[in-house]
């Protein structure tokens, strides 16, 4: 197969591994800098050009679209879909999962376990918003943040009020969530490919920190997940419409709670921790499932 990898940086671990895994299995792998591709939208034959030439003959496309380029990245991916190229994850699913609020609303509607969550812009009764999520301690998040940036733990209601007021002054939409103390600063990253959790790891925040993101100095270790956690991860990925996803779960006193569903999960942490060939499994999924015009939205955007 001829497989495109949409990635701003061919040297990133995840991009490198996907290219290696594809070549090992005999495929032609082409890395395309998402922002440098440009499109002919309104022609009878949709096209993408890159470095002055049309991109043609691709069987599949692997989107590795960073959060900051979601809008343009999804547009390029959608154009591939219009051309009948099979996407590892569809543009609509990526856009859906990048909107944290929409994700939680969809997961909640399907009855998937979530921390109690409030959402506000300029609340006229801040103490009521704080009570809505069972009071302090609580976590406040800016909607656009990634890798644990824009996430604040407030130990008291007074601190929470100050932080909410500060974000209001910045005209930011904010998410207020109950703090799951029993998780002890740890979460579980379940790596979903197709209808299986192919690998999972526990991420533990460094001492004095509550954010377990590896980018924030958290450490990763092997973990055996429960059948309920496995089911939760698979259902969450399915609700988002993602074929490949990193589902972040907290262990709480009332079962597994989904924190986030990541449409472009990093491979380094999970491969190094579990010694599994995750990149190879992703290519294997494409081998089994890809075909022209096989998107669930049938390439109609």
Swiss-Prot record:
Pfam families linked to this entry: RimK, Rimk_N
InterPro entries: ATP-grasp, ATP-grasp_RimK-type, ATP_grasp_subdomain_1, RimK, Rimk_N, Rp_bS6_RimK/Lys_biosynth_LsyX
Binding annotation for ATP: 141, 178-179, 187, 211-213
Chain ranges of the ATP-grasp domain: 104-287
Positions with a binding annotation for Mn(2+) 2: 260, 262
Recorded superkingdom: Bacteria
GO molecular function: ATP binding; metal ion binding; ribosomal S6-glutamic acid ligase activity
Gene Ontology cellular component annotations, sorted alphabetically: cytoplasm
GO biological process: protein modification process; SOS response; translation
Record protein name field: Probable alpha-L-glutamate ligase
Native organism: Pseudomonas syringae pv. syringae (strain B728a)
Organism classification: Bacteria, Pseudomonadati, Pseudomonadota, Gammaproteobacteria, Pseudomonadales
